[in-house]
Regions:
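Charged helix-capping and loop-helix junction motifs
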Residues: 203-209
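Bacterial N-terminal signal peptides that target proteins for export
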Residues: 1-12
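Active-site-proximal beta-strand/loop segments in catalytic clefts of secreted hydrolases
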Residues: 100-103, 130-135, 164-167, 190-194, ...
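Bacterial signal peptide processing site
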Residues: 24-27
């Protein structure tokens, strides 16, 4: 019995030793677990890289990119129609011009004036032609008592016109007083005449007479004449265009129905040499001062500062002169 007890005691001791050994292995295992914790720490250090990736997400966010590119490529059909600006400019009111002369409706000069007005881009001229049926040079401001007859015709180039049986002033009177036209012209152009109408001769000029007939009816008027000899109408038309370009606003600023102070008389030389030297504002002359009225003009003449329309014309300038509405008193 005693031996058995000893054996049992020995067995218990062995079990205790085994348990102790087991505890020791657990501690060793626990000691070797430290590297595992280190590995876990290494994994934890990779988290910031994930965080960096997460930070980059806003720069590539799909909600940001469309918002940036939409204004550049997006069409505007969604805008309300009411806010769409107009794509057309309202048409410009035409400038209404009555054209007349004293050489008759079939003369080259009046047709050249008509064609030059129609060639303007801006403003748009609405041209109406009413002129004597026949040549009426030298008739001044003469007019017929009572109504006059008129006939539909065409100018040299085929433009519609009305031919009046009477004086140059009758043509204007028929248009404005007899109801020949149904509007009030913005201004009247008389000419261009075949031959100059300088100061000493304005009162016998039918070209000036027709312009005066318009002016006394409170309508601005221009009388334009081309110098004798070669009748350089092209040069005259250039002068007329230049004059209108610089003075159209003044002509159109005239208030309908208010008095007109003067007629503008323009005389353009036909140059035998050189070219017209430009437009110059001068008063009417009272005599020819020795100039040959029917001679060609040397437009290379160097003289400057002409005193009147006679000097200006014969030294190569286009003379622009305000002309009284009434003829100068005789005697």
């Amino acid at each position: 019995m005693k031996l058995a007890t000893t054996s049992r005691t020995t067995a218990v001791a062995l079990v205790a030793l085994a348990a102790l050994a087991a505890c020791s292995s657990v501690e060793i295992t626990s000691t070797t677990a430290a590297p595992v914790q280190t590995a876990t720490t290494v994994q934890a250090t990779t988290v910031p890289s994930v965080t960096v990736a997460a930070t980059a997400v806003p720069t590539t966010s799909p909600t940001t990119t469309p918002a940036t590119t939409a204004p550049a490529t997006g069409p505007a059909p969604t805008a309300p129609p009411a806010t769409t600006p107009p794509t057309t400019v309202p048409p410009e009111e035409p400038v209404r011009v009555l054209v007349t002369n004293d050489d008759g409706y079939s003369a080259e000069g009046i047709d050249m004036v008509v064609q030059s007005l129609l060639a303007f881009d801006r403003p748009v001229f609405e041209v109406t032609v009413v002129a004597p049926l026949t040549q009426q040079s030298g008739q001044g401001g003469n007019f017929t008592d009572g109504p006059v007859n008129a006939t539909s015709v065409t100018t040299l180039s085929g433009y519609p016109a009305t031919a009046v049986e009477g004086f140059p002033a009758d043509a204007v009177r028929w248009a404005l007083d007899q109801g020949g036209i149904d509007f009030i012209p913005d201004f009247v152009i008389s000419g261009t005449n075949e031959g100059q109408n300088l100061g000493p001769f304005v009162d016998v000029s039918g070209t000036v007479g027709a312009a005066r007939a318009a002016a006394v009816r409170n309508i601005p008027a221009i009388a334009i004449s081309t110098g004798f000899a070669s009748f350089d109408y092209e040069a005259t038309i250039d002068v007329l265009r230049d004059y209108l370009a610089g003075n159209l606003d003044t002509l159109l600023a005239h208030e309908a129905g208010t008095p007109v102070a003067t007629v503008i008389s323009i005389n353009v030389p036909s140059c035998s040499a050189g070219e017209v030297r430009g437009l110059v504002d001068v008063p009417l002359g009272t005599d020819l001062q020795g100039f040959d009225y029917g001679a060609d003009v040397d437009c290379t003449n160097p003289a400057e500062s002409p005193a009147d329309d006679v000097q200006a014309f014969f030294t190569g300038f286009a003379a622009v002169s305000p002309t009284p509405l009434e003829p100068a008193p005789v005697g």
